[in-house]
């Protein structure tokens, strides 16, 4: 109790509670103003959608937390989001049930072993294999170009090998009369003589009747 009608006694001082006011349920206490300037504790505050937020967790015993629980809401939500992301990544490594939140309930808290599913790896890699063909075609051109430390890389012709494999696998049927392509292999001379009208037409000469192609 202060003497002199509520005035502090000589040599005394007011308590912090009577000087600053009773902490309220929200907002700054009486006699205090929340600012966005950097505090002596080396962290800043800002207003997000009307909510005061800081970039550092506030201790539970801090008067700021006691005045306004929204003071730490921004940090709390960010920490929850980071935790859920880590839960999802860790769950994907050990289980294949699809959602890690299922393990929070007792009726579906069992784990499904990923090693028992043989087709899982194939199902995961299938999109990569299909989509990788287009990327490989784009990279083949750049890979074949010369660089200061490498000569030009020429592609290997594979169509001849594929054609040989097809001929080896060919089986004559009754509709073909039991004939194969070797029965029709004859020496054909595709040489066009000098008196051919095609040559004259290409050279711009007067058109003449083309000579027939001679088959030897």
Curated annotation (Swiss-Prot):
Documented EC number(s): 3.1.3.16, 3.1.3.48
GO molecular function: protein serine/threonine phosphatase activity; protein tyrosine phosphatase activity
Coiled coil: none
Keywords: Early protein, Hydrolase, Protein phosphatase
Active site: 95
Comp. bias intervals (Acidic residues): 172-187
Biased composition (Low complexity): 21-32
Protein name (Swiss-Prot/TrEMBL): Dual specificity protein phosphatase VP2
Organism: Chicken anemia virus (isolate Japan 82-2)
Gene (UniProt): VP2
